Amino acid sequence: MQPATLQWSSYVLQLRLTTAAILKPGELRYFKCGLGICPPSSSVVCTCRDESSFAASPFTYIDPKDYGNIPFAVHNISDLDLDLGRLPIVLNIFALPYANVTVSNLPVQRIEAYDRHAIPHGQCEAQFILYGPLTRIKIYAADIRWTEKTPEEPTRYLFNADIWINLQNTPLDQIFNSAKIEFISHRHVSISRILLCGNLLILKTVYENDYLLDDTFFPEKLNIQLSLTPHTADITMSQNQETLLKCNVGSITVGATKNIVSNLITPFHCSFHTIFESNSNFTGFFIPKLLHGISITTCIWDETRPLYITMKAQKKNCRINYSQELGKVFFFPKQILPPGNNIEFSWTEMSNIYVNIESPNGPVKDIVALASQPVSRAPSLTTVAHVTPEISMGIFLKSLRIAFDKEHLVPLHFFLKPGESTRMEFMPPETPQSLTILEGDVGIRFIPCHNNYSHRSSP
């Protein structure tokens, strides 16, 4: 008797899906097939096109809100019609366990010298409250002298100012190395850096605003409250770009540095001036969000280097708003994710599945090639005979040249509501399978695609 829901676990699931549909040249569509996963702990679930697939699909992460019924994208990048009933969509799904790092985006940076001749404001009063391992500072500054800067997004105001705080009789050992902003009296003002020079604490203050939405100008007075704690973070950012790089637990959400209305010819870029340090322990891995009509490159974010993201349009008139999410950065130990020195640029990341075998010349990664096998229209869930649960295998990202062995992956619990003709050709063991194959016409349902237009809102 067919179970109401198929359930199984696997390190890698390969989809080899067919459907009675034809994609025109350049056509991009989204679909669901009823496949879901149980939420994994501290892992990012990725989907990537297999190198055997004629249909393209972006390398992306699955948003947790979509775990119940995963959406996929399929794109015909050829000049010919693509018959999805004859040429299957081939995707690989796997989960990477990221490091649960702590991130300090506003460290107190000690410097030796600073130009003290031009006092940047008329009045500054500070109250220091000492709680042992915490110092709270309440600041009032007036007659602030703002300096205009040129933003990357031309519809925005950008002004910088310094606020100097005399430490008075506060012991330097109470000026701890990690700061947290508790209150700023103006919503368009942020603190990008905090510097300590002798008995002077310097707040590098930023006023940034979209004047098309809010034509208020920079404030002449500010009330600020911040706290300092002796916190040693795994990742230390060189500056705080809170509207663009938002620190989460275990990841950083990356937002666009400007408003973008795409064309089909010219790639566009977002660059971030912030770098990070981790004492050579971690490497950042930027994984794009699935955005309709926009292709975003995956990249390695190396320590002490700025983050640089390249995009291009797959459809006309797709819009990305300032600070709109482009993807997330996850951090991995350098033993798993080495620096990205040998990356080949590619708009469409592809993957393959391999088995580690011993040869006379040493270990070899033998590609698991399934492309030569015809895909039945009848849906089925199978395993590959020689890829047993005990075997050493993994997944390789071709452009990034990164191999994730099985010990660096997390098995996923999958579930699927099957059709009457769906065959499950193995009994799910207690041990997760290394590789499972879901193939055939499982009932793909194409879903409406919406342009990335959204009402404009200030961050």
Swiss-Prot record:
Pfam families the record matches: Herpes_UL82_83
Keywords, alphabetical: Glycoprotein, Signal
Top-rank lineage group of the source organism: Viruses
UniProt-annotated glycosylation sites, renumbered to this chain: N76, N100, N281, N321, N452
UniProt cross-references to InterPro entries, sorted A to Z: Herpes_UL82/UL83 (IPR008649)
Signal peptide start and end residues: 1-20
Family: Belongs to the herpesviridae UL82 family.
Protein name from the UniProt record: Protein U54
Gene name as annotated: U54
